[in-house]
């Protein structure tokens, strides 16, 4: 098969995945709106309003970070449980998994119970996903693993809707890099062009591992099946 045919096939698969995830995201939003309406109705009926800080601004446990092959790793190599997460920075289900597991995994990684490897891939081929992944690659290569891990988190915290993927500008991405502590002249230079080698390596991993959806999660080398709730349950059961 020619390179042109391979690229065309990959683009078609990415378009199909984007369409499927967009449909699922629309359904999820409809469900969330309905739930919010019910909750607000209950609050009004009770005549009370809860106003307080949530956990979104609470920092995760401090954990040692190291660089992998196209990835950032949280936790020690000797941890009894190994979790690998293949993810796309634009994938809404990856963000859902992040929101559901980040604190749990970091706390247990800090305690030596699990090692977590975050491996970004460009499955959806979206504007935000590619800008985010390129920034991650730049920080991973030219700054510190700790900054790359922090940037990873910030990129999910600031993920736009898929329909608004281009809304986060390169200057805003740079702002996240600075907030993560990963800014330096080499990183800023790297941000000006796409890291073709990093993207190609991620594409090859996708082909080798036959990854067709995100998030794809491996626990001790074995893939976890099901949706995000199933993955969360499997991770929590494995770590204990």
Task: List the model feature ranges, each with a label.
Residues 64-81:
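A short beta-strand-turn-helix
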Residues 85-88, 211:
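Processing junctions and N-termini across compartments
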Residues 68-72, 102-103, 202-205:
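A generic local structural motif
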Residues 79, 87-89, 95-172:
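Structural alpha/beta surface segment adjacent to cysteine/selenocysteine redox centers
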Residues 3-32, 37-45, 51, 175-240:
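C-terminal cap of thioredoxin/glutaredoxin-like
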Residues 83, 91, 217:
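Conserved S/T- and glycine-rich ATP-binding loop of Class I adenylate-forming
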Residues 44-65:
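C-terminal region of N-terminal signal peptides and the immediate post-cleavage residues
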